[in-house]
């Protein structure tokens, strides 16, 4: 039985600890994989996931209902991932011309390098501008509606749809290249 978001919210108001556990149970794995696709490395994804749920716990009483609970959770997760990426970019000094996320992908022991197409797909996604990357991941992997994506990335549904389609075109072009 899956518990719906309204039940989670009413439980959280009556018993914040229990409500928080319900949110973790429902969204924990999805949040980890959403963050993982953005930051690439397993350890970074674990850290950002933990920070996401700490932030959720601290701010549960501030949820206004402007967007769905799913969108709110993903927005906080996205912000944590982007915060981590921003901190990392400030400290990165590279001689390698590839994006730092691609370099981390290559160093991650949790990635299956025998599936070259999957690795190439991840490289293509990591090379996208942030909004396109977010729109693509949220639509393709998480199967969210454009309205939810818009709430998460702070845009309109039309802009989210445009970002997704631009990302898809760039990924197809990258996948068809000989690189």
Each model region followed by its residue ranges:
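Structural recognition of an alpha-helix C-terminal capping motif at a helix-to-coil junction
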Residues: 33, 47-54, 67-79
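Short alpha-helical segment immediately N-terminal to, or the first helix within
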Residues: 23-25, 34, 137-139, 144
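Amphipathic, non-transmembrane alpha-helical scaffold segments
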Residues: 24-28, 74, 114, 118, ...
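Arg/Lys-rich amphipathic alpha helix in sigma70-family domain 2
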Residues: 61-65, 75-95
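Internal acidic/polar
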Residues: 2-5, 91-121
């Amino acid at each position: 039985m899956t518990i719906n978001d309204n039940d989670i919210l009413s439980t959280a108001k009556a018993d914040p600890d229990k409500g928080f556990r319900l949110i973790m149970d429902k969204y924990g794995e999805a949040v980890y994989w959403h963050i993982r696709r953005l930051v690439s490395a397993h350890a970074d994804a674990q850290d950002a996931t933990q920070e996401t749920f700490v932030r959720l716990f601290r701010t549960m009483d501030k949820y206004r209902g402007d967007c769905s609970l799913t969108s709110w959770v993903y927005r906080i997760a996205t912000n944590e991932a982007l915060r981590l990426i921003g901190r990392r970019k400030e400290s990165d000094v590279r001689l390698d011309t590839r994006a730092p996320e691609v370099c981390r992908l290559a160093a991650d022991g949790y990635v299956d390098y025998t599936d070259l197409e999957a690795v190439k797909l991840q490289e293509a996604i990591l090379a996208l501008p942030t909004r396109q990357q977010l729109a693509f991941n949220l639509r393709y992997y998480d199967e969210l509606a454009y309205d939810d994506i818009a709430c998460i990335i702070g845009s309109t549904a039309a802009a989210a749809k445009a970002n997704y389609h631009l990302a898809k075109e760039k990924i197809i072009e990258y996948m068809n290249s000989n690189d």
